[in-house]
Amino acid sequence: MSFEYSRKSALRLFLFVLAVFLCISVIATPAAAAEEQTFTEKFYQNFIEDDRYKYLVTGLQNTLIITVFSLIMGLVLGALIAIVRTVHDMKGKLKLLNLVARGYLTVIRGTPVLIQLLIIYFVIFASVDIALVPVAIVAFGLNSAAYIAEIIRAGINAVPKGQFEAGSSLGLPFAITMITIILPQAIKNILPALCNEGIVLLKETSVSGYIGLIDLTKGGDIIRSQTYEAFMPYIAVALIYLTVVVVLTHFVKKLEVKLNAS
């Protein structure tokens, strides 16, 4: 039953997106101009001719790859930063690491992600022959880690202090207590917030084209530069982003329902 419901929901979403695309296209097309291309001709010119749709396919693929691996990097680095800051707050230890972590969070959260991307590509990796996708993953991973660190830290602080005392009474070292008892509870509490961070990250990757990488937005821009038609490529890009975000949001809501029920 749930599979059938999901399939019907996906079909309704596809039809809705298609209807929006068609309605906007019809409204934006001047009917009075006899020499104006028809919708079909414009669609063919923008996406079918010279296989231009492949720019969007390649762009979507790169966008998803960057998002997934940047999120993984952000989770690992963010968890380490959150643990360092929590240990310092609770034990007063790791003062130097905590100072570095606070400086990192201040710099990353206080500067635009686009500037960070440009610095990493044109300054840090200026003399290194490296593919563009890994550069973007590093840039967005470092950016995402700063926000994920605070999310995880908030989740750790939300765990009752008695859990730390329980681990200590069992003779477990602080690190083992943190990894085996505290973090699993914290992750469960903040999982929806982490998923939402992934959605934000997906949209932030739209600036990847500034370093010459063909992401989804850049793919649409390439089509525009070849056809001199801005409407269809950019609307297609917007609808693809919208579709992906709506699907991810749907799964996040289902996840929240399951977590609240457990």
Question: Predicted regions span which residues?
Answer:
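Transmembrane alpha-helices and adjacent helix-loop boundaries
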Residues: 2-16, 21-262
